[in-house]
Amino acid sequence: MSDNQSWNSSGSEEDPETESGPPVERCGVLSKWTNYIHGWQDRWVVLKNNALSYYKSEDETEYGCRGSICLSKAVITPHDFDECRFDISVNDSVWYLRAQDPDHRQQWIDAIEQHKTESGYGSESSLRRHGSMVSLVSGASGYSATSTSSFKKGHSLREKLAEMETFRDILCRQVDTLQKYFDACADAVSKDELQRDKVVEDDEDDFPTTRSDGDFLHSTNGNKEKLFPRVTPKGINGIDFKGEAITFKATTVGIPATLSHCIELMVKREDSWQKRLDKETEKKRRTEEAYKNAMTELKKKSHFGGPDYEEGPNSLINEEEFFDAVEAALDRQDEIEEQSQSEKVRLHWPTSLPSGDAFSSVGTHRFVQKPYSRSSSVSSIDLVSASDDVHRFSSQVEEMVQNHMTYSLQDVGGDANWQLVVEEGEMKVYRREVEENGIVLDPLKATRAVKGVTGHEVCNYFWNVDVRNDWETTIENFHVVETLADNAIIIYQTHKRVWPASQRDVLYLSVIRKIPALTENDPETWIVCNFSVDHDSAPLNNRCVRAKINVAMICQTLVSPPEGNQEISRDNILCKITYVANVNPGGWAPASVLRAVAKREYPKFLKRFTSYVQEKTAGKPILF
């Protein structure tokens, strides 16, 4: 009856919750983070039936949703810095969403929380409903299950406990028997005292009688039997008091012995269970540690490319993790590039030599006289002066070239504070640490001497856009925005994304020029100068961070005369390269990461490029 009453009362309590209507459905446009390439994109989001779904647009809902998550176990987290953003995570899946304004965000959060509360996991009424049946079943069988499992491996202890119960029953019976005997004895003593009092009174009232012969006749009531009659207490017949006392003593001795044995068994069992507990605790600790590490790795993978881990002032990734991620990405790019180069070498044979009409002989040495076309591997541009290079950036080009020829070729000693950061054979890389508003602006200067090539050849390969993809591995795409002159072009190029750093693009003017020698002893000098400019055809965009550059490749050709009348070969020429780079990367990349990456990438670039030039010019006529 009580069970029925409890069920009825429980049902009456749930009636109001059952009658309450479902949560209100909601739909609208929210910005969703797609990936690090496309960033935030507007999506049509629908909140319905305790699930959150999104579509590309409202018009495409009939084609099905692009993604959906159940809100039962979802965690909604408003962002600490962005007032319009909130994140929804379910296990290792995370949605990054942005509303139009803070009020709009709060409306969405409230609606999602309401759906979550009304779901099976979030509702208290659901917990009561599901918990009631479980509690009834478990309450009925809990004790029996526990006792059964406890005694499965405890036969000795169970037997000793049975002995204790037997001792208890024996002791109770013995106590009852002895108590009964003592009560009977007490009743008998009381009755005997009353009888004695009565006998004494009768004796006092009994006078002697006169016999016929005149003698006194005394009564025999005063004899022993009359004065102290033998009274047997009722109820004590058949009780062996001595035997009961001995048995009682043995029982009381057996109880402590059995109890001691029980305690000993329990101590042994406790030690055994303690060892098992310690083992399980250690296993639990290892499991929790492995789970924690696994969850950490899963979170890293799930947030890979997430907006919180991107380069920025509020990035959640520290400098060490930032550098590790950048280094790992660069290593992957290097592996891909090595595979690509191996495939090119296997499939493509080196470019054939130009036809004979492109050469003329002077003495016994052949050199290129006719320029290559723009589509050829190298274009020869004979520029002795800048008189024909008149365009709107001419004055800026002149200033840049003069500055590089004046300062870039100076010795690294003195007060310039150049630091030698890399030295590999004849190649040396120097750096001056410069920061402005927290942004690293370190100028870098690299010098290297390359045998078998001329400065003209090196500069042509560095300037010519037709062969740029053959040696430049960091560019995603590029195009010529404007051709200012035969030796001056404006280029827009986008560099490959290296997560977590933001993607960079560069808009710069590239000019190649031959510097006239002031004296006969001065070496032949060529220069390629690249510096950032602005152009209406390539405005800033939100996808990339615009970097600013000022780069110069200065090459001087040194010729050692051949022995006798032999012709000049590539063994007699040496190119002294001076590469100077001033780069403002923009953005929020950590200074330590930028310096470490520059120290790694600049020497690798210079070695890769010069090796490429040596490979391309091997076996070809020398281009002075």
UniProtKB/Swiss-Prot annotation:
PANTHER family attached to this UniProt entry: CERAMIDE TRANSFER PROTEIN, PHOSPHATIDYLCHOLINE TRANSFER PROTEIN
PROSITE patterns cross-referenced by the UniProt entry: PH_DOMAIN, START
Any one Gene Ontology molecular-function term assigned to this protein's record: ceramide binding
Region (Disordered): 1-24
Domain START intervals: 389-618
Residue positions, PTM Phosphotyrosine: Y372
GO biological process, any: ER to Golgi ceramide transport
Function comment: Shelters ceramides and diacylglycerol lipids inside its START domain and mediates the intracellular trafficking of ceramides and diacylglycerol lipids in a non-vesicular manner.
Major subcellular location class: cytoplasm
Gene3D superfamilies in alphabetical order: 3.30.530.20, Pleckstrin-homology domain (PH domain)/Phosphotyrosine-binding domain (PTB)
Modified residues (Phosphoserine): S126, S132, S135, S315, S373, S377, S380
Record-annotated PH domain positions: 23-117
Catalytic reactions on record: N-hexadecanoylsphing-4-enine(in) = N-hexadecanoylsphing-4-enine(out)
UniProt biased composition (Polar residues): 1-11
Name listed for the protein in its UniProt record: Ceramide transfer protein
Positions bound to an N-acylsphing-4-enine: E472, Q493, N530, Y579
Listed GO CC annotations: endoplasmic reticulum; Golgi apparatus
Domain of life assignment: Eukaryota
Coiled-coil stretches noted in the UniProt entry, renumbered to this chain: 263-303
Short motif (FFAT): ranges: 321-327
Keyword Phosphoprotein included in the entry's annotation: yes
